[in-house]
A protein has these predicted regions:
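BZIP DNA-binding basic region
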Residues: 127-180, 187-189
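Short, surface-exposed, polar/charged, turn-prone segments marking secondary-structure boundaries
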Residues: 40-41, 49-51, 173-176, 183-184
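Short helix-coil boundary/hinge micro-motifs
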Residues: 1-146, 153-154
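N-terminal intrinsically disordered/low-complexity leader segments
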Residues: 2, 185-186
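Amphipathic, soluble alpha-helical interaction motifs
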Residues: 81, 182-185
Length: 189
């Protein structure tokens, strides 16, 4: 599945990977108080739709929501381990692999493009988990980065030619950093 960058329905899609975009559903990770974007089962159903995984309404239970949050946090810790060059936590690998082993919905092509067959939450979480396995265990694993923005913890795949991208979004965090540097430079002159 090709990543769609940007913000949709209150969710940020800046990671360049479905798995990394899913980790952004817990916002403000670098602040004292995080902001949970998946507060209710309905929020998870909205995220599936915003991510392009579900065309039809998905029935999400409280148990599904708990499983989704656990998968999200495992993905986040695994990606941070990749960023830091640390070993991948075994418990998180087991959780990710357990989700990735589940059956996934089948993509189908129609006149408007690719759509996913109707699926339940575990199958959609399997799609996210497989994206995580492929990213964190594949050739782009060394291109996973964390935004250098002061308060931003978004993870992304650095697809820049040089491999030195610093921010999740040049128009957001990148611009803020450049403005702060400019102001600091002018203050000291």
């Amino acid at each position: 599945m090709e990543p769609m960058l940007g913000d949709r329905d209150g969710f940020r899609f800046r990671g360049g990977s479905l798995a990394l975009d899913f980790t952004a559903t817990l916002a403000a990770r670098k602040r004292e108080q995080t902001r949970e974007l998946l507060e209710t089962p309905r929020d998870l159903a909205r995220w599936f739709a915003a991510a392009g995984l579900a065309v039809h309404k998905v029935n999400v239970t409280e148990d599904d929501l708990a499983a989704a949050r656990a998968l999200r946090e495992a993905l986040y810790r695994l990606a941070l381990a990749r960023v830091g060059g640390a070993p991948l936590p075994a418990a998180d690998r087991r959780l990710l692999n357990r989700h990735a082993a589940l059956a996934t919905p089948a993509p189908r092509l129609d006149a408007a493009g690719v759509h996913w067959s109707r699926a339940e939450t575990p199958a959609l979480l399997a799609v996210i988990a497989r994206a995580g396995v492929e990213l964190l265990g594949g050739p782009l694993a060394d291109r996973v980065r964390q935004c250098s923005g002061r308060w931003c913890a978004i993870l992304f795949v650095d697809m820049s030619r040089s491999g030195h991208r610093k921010w999740c979004s040049m128009s957001g965090c990148g611009n803020k950093a450049k403005v702060a540097t400019f102001r600091e430079r002018n203050r000291t002159e």
